[in-house]
Amino acid sequence: CIRDSIKSDYVLEVDITPNRADACSHYGVARDLYAYLIQNGRQATLTRPSVEGFKVDNHDMDITVEVENTEACPRYAGVSIKGVTVKESPDWLQNKLRLIGLRPINNIVDITNYILHAYGQPLHCFDADKIKGGKIVVKTVAEGTKFTTLDEVERTLSDRDLMICNTEEPMCIAGVFGGLDSGTTEQTVDVFLESAYFNPTWVRKTARRHGLSTDSSFRFERGIDPNGTIYALKEAALLVKELAGGTIASEIKDNYPHPVADFMVELNYEKAHSLIGKVIPAETIKSIVTSLEMKIVNETPEGVTLQVPAYRVDVQRDCDVVEDILRIY
């Protein structure tokens, strides 16, 4: 009985406004809670598992990656894992997924879903034997190309749909939905694990064109953290080794020709006080912004220059910072 196997727990349902892409994960919500608790005099720490244990075991699989359309795919990373055993996930992982309304499938798919909801980074796992030519090509395909997705529906592709392909055919609608024939099965032995950052506009338009809405497209449309792909990839790879066995059989392939920079925002204390309608001490303001992972790169008696993480797509102006201060204060 599922009810007996799941220990008592609290499940919080959080409504996320469209501008808060950074909060579309457990870690993202915890980040805000941490800032609030610190500001209110509570002891709190914000941590996530270390990936220092990630290492390449051998170089037995050499799947290459080529990104033809860097506008639609600013960053694409992946790693090969050889000799996995696809099976049922352990109870702890199954229970975590059930608690958030997901149905466990197998250890490989469950790991990608776990990372997605924990850190907001969608992942996709390909059966490496189905990557024809040993090469991943990220590109658009000819208008009218037929492609069958995981739900067994044959779809007609647009030449504006970004696809993850091998050397012969498309395997996945990038950031939206996998193909019927490229995913992992119980017979899968070798996998290629993908972690990417796709252009939100491209994903949104493709999802609408095909009438699709998935957990992955929901996050890509709003804008994930372009600089968090490698952490999520390493954490997923370590979990695959732990739960499915195998060896990390390649270096991480990371195509990131134009890194996305953090935002620089000037905050003037007097203007902040004017917008807020009251005076908040400078030390309190600095405490709030730093607890939200913004860095103070310059400071004067009149204000601060802040380095805002790239994942905070909603904080690009001083008034956006003021809104954050008010949320936490």
How should each PLM-predicted stretch be described?
Residues 3-329:
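RNA/tRNA-interacting regions in translation and RNA-turnover enzymes
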